[in-house]
């Protein structure tokens, strides 16, 4: 009898252990993040007309491989800035507005489960991004993009995905610095909340309402950095550290590779990862969640940056989107004129140049302004002598900026230029010094790099001036006259042509430089184009048929006995070739 009781007890104990074991389950979730793809959908650069690295065509091969391993537990997410960059995006933004947008079509085909808005997506304007969002088979998020009419998010703030009983909440946010760069008409009816308080609010709601096992931040904002006025441009790392609840923060926007674990204020580990840009790498995150009786008992997060250039171009993908490839290729292959000489942005750093002065000339003609501001937007862009094609316009003018005319006093014009040249040029103490302001140290045998962003190196046209590089910052500029020889006055108000990025405060040249408050910038705008500058460039070239670009020589660096030889040396350091 005792023997039977012991056997029964043993069987009961074994059954309980088996039941407990059956109640415990380990689930592996794979997250793949693309960010800042910038229209790099095909392994071909439609601007430079050559084969290219990265691309969604390679990402498709990687995603397909991972889905064979993880099935539906493989989650593809896109973190924004997909609608601007290559002509592939431009064509479906503005030329073919009837077909499904190729960015939506491709991500739908690849099985993307969630997307996020980026600042360059906003820059395309409501007509483009509203259409694209509707065509996506997945939600495009934006918790901190607020509809002024309702006070609620304009887009879905978060998405909850359930895989094998594991609930994954994804909270999407964008850098709130949009108004510092973009005209209000592109984001009319909206405003952008700071990321950290927005994250606190929605993490609390998500935890209370959704009972998630994992919380993922999908943030189109970089690691840390710029504070524009009272707005923090890149707050992803701040949110990861200061707002408890996140297991993973997927970053973007700053085009910088990152993969690191940080500890938040609650003492928990958070993976922070950023795949930079152009789909050369993707964020590859592995979540392992163990649940017992419906509760998480163990959770681990590992991440790496997966190199897409180790993967083949997907033939399946290329065949599927062959019609779109052909449409874009036909678009960029259209001849619009002829140019009588080769022009390059490389000359623009060392003085008046045909490349930049062509844009100055166009801005002045379109706007009727007295003065023009313009910077090289591509580091080493070049348009070769001969036929000009639509593709060349993306080299000549990289971004979809509008043209503004603003009212600035003579003193504000000078102060604007003082800041531009202060971040551009070194203060030379001898003829052996660098003319350019480089990152230190400049190592022998290696290329030099600018200390600051070259897209903020604005020169002017419409005025004659010199830049004395022996003087300290704030004292370099001497404006001698208007370009027609009439006097220039510090007190007079002038009409100044410049792009919308600059006119909205981008680069701080108008605010920190000219001393105009952010709030007053909009009041200074007296004219704005309906279309981007590239559109008007194309129109201008088609009308002219043959371009004869030349440097206007309205400004120069002095003293020339120092600056001319220094320019030759610095050109060699920057580009690895002699200045012609």
Predicted segment positions?
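Bacterial Sec-dependent N-terminal signal peptides
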Residues: 1-25
């Amino acid at each position: 009898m005792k023997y039977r009781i012991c056997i029964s007890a043993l069987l009961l104990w074994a059954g309980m252990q088996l039941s407990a074991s059956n109640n415990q389950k380990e689930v592996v979730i794979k997250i793949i993040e693309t960010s800042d793809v910038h229209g790099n959908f095909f392994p071909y650069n439609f601007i430079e007309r050559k084969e290219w690295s990265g691309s969604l065509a390679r990402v498709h091969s990687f995603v397909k491989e991972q889905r064979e391993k993880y099935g539906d537990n493989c989650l593809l997410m896109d973190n924004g800035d997909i609608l601007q960059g290559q002509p592939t995006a431009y064509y479906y933004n503005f030329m073919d507005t009837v077909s499904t947008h190729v960015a939506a079509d491709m991500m739908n085909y690849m099985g993307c489960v969630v997307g996020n808005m980026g600042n360059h997506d906003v820059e395309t304007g409501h007509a483009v991004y509203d259409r694209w969002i509707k065509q996506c088979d997945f939600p495009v998020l934006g918790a901190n993009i607020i509809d002024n009419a309702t006070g609620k998010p304009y887009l879905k703030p978060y998405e909850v995905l359930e895989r094998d009983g594991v609930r994954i909440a994804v909270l999407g946010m964008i850098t709130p610095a949009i108004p510092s760069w973009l005209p209000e008409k592109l984001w009319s009816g909206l405003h952008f909340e700071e990321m950290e308080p927005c994250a606190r609010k929605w993490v609390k709601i998500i935890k209370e309402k959704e009972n998630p096992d994992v919380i993922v931040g999908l943030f189109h904002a970089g690691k840390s950095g710029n504070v524009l006025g009272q707005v923090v441009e890149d707050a992803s790392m701040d949110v990861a550290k200061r707002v408890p609840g996140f297991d993973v923060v997927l970053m973007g926007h700053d085009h910088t590779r990152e993969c690191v674990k940080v500890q938040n204020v609650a003492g928990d580990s958070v993976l922070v990862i950023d795949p930079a840009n152009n789909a050369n790498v993707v964020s590859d995150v592995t979540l392992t969640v163990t649940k017992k009786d419906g509760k998480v008992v163990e959770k681990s997060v590992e991440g790496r940056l997966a190199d897409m250039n180790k993967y083949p171009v997907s033939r399946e993908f290329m065949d599927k989107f062959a019609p779109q490839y052909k449409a874009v290729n036909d678009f960029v292959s259209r001849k619009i004129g002829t140019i009588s000489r080769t022009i390059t942005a490389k000359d623009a750093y060392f003085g008046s140049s045909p490349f930049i002065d062509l844009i100055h000339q166009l801005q002045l003609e379109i706007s009727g302004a007295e003065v023009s501001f313009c910077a090289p937007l591509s580091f080493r862009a070049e348009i070769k002598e001969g036929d000009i094609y639509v593709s060349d316009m993306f080299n000549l003018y990289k971004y979809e900026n509008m043209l503004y005319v603003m009212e600035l006093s003579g003193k504000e014009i000078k102060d604007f230029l003082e800041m531009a040249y202060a971040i551009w040029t070194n203060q030379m103490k001898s003829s052996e010094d660098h003319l350019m302001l480089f990152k230190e140290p400049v190592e022998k045998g290696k290329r030099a790099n600018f200390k600051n962003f070259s897209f903020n190196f604005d020169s002017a046209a419409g005025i004659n001036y010199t830049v004395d590089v022996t003087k300290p910052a704030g004292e370099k500029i001497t404006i001698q006259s208007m370009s027609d020889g009439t006097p220039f006055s510090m007190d007079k108000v002038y009409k100044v042509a410049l792009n919308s990025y600059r006119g909205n405060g981008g680069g701080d040249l108008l605010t920190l430089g000219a001393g105009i408050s952010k709030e007053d910038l909009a009041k200074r705008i007296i004219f704005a184009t309906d279309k981007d500058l590239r559109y008007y460039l194309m129109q201008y070239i088609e009308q002219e048929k043959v371009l004869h670009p030349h440097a206007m020589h309205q400004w120069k660096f002095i003293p020339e006995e120092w600056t001319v030889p220094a320019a030759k040396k610095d050109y060699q350091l920057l580009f690895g070739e002699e200045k012609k």
